[in-house]
Amino acid sequence: MGLLNRILRTITKDDDVTEFRKELADREKELEPFLKYQEELHKVFDKYLALMEIIEKEWSILYNSKDYSSKLAYKIEKECYEAINYYKKVREVDLKYGETPMSGSKAFTKLALLYERQGEFEKAVSVCKQACSFGMDERKRMLRIIKKVGRAPT
């Protein structure tokens, strides 16, 4: 027998039962926006998290191989962009429900590192700028890459 039925059996007066049911309904209404937020968030966040786990494992393999022009490197590049898109969607859901948005993503870092190791410095700088626009502190990496290119920061 459920908890609700046990509680209802201990309430003896009809007024008490009515009041209890009203209170329960009020609490359910209070929880409704949070439950909607959780449902909408997890549809996107679960995909983001699964993809980030894949990227981390593949990055380890790529890092050990040092072959940043391999098929795996291009697969990771594609997955980083996909993860960044999920990251943006997670932030949108957070903001829609008045929650503090997710503060950063390693997908930006991995993508910037990948471009840097491929010698694609301007692309790496662009990724760092995008990360900064989401509140991540990628300025040191960006300035280091800009020095490699030999140009002034813009």
Task: Kindly give the residue locations of the regions a language model identified.
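Alpha-solenoid repeat scaffolds
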Residues: 65-69, 86, 90, 121, ...
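Acidic, Ser/Thr-rich low-complexity linear motifs
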Residues: 89-103, 137-146
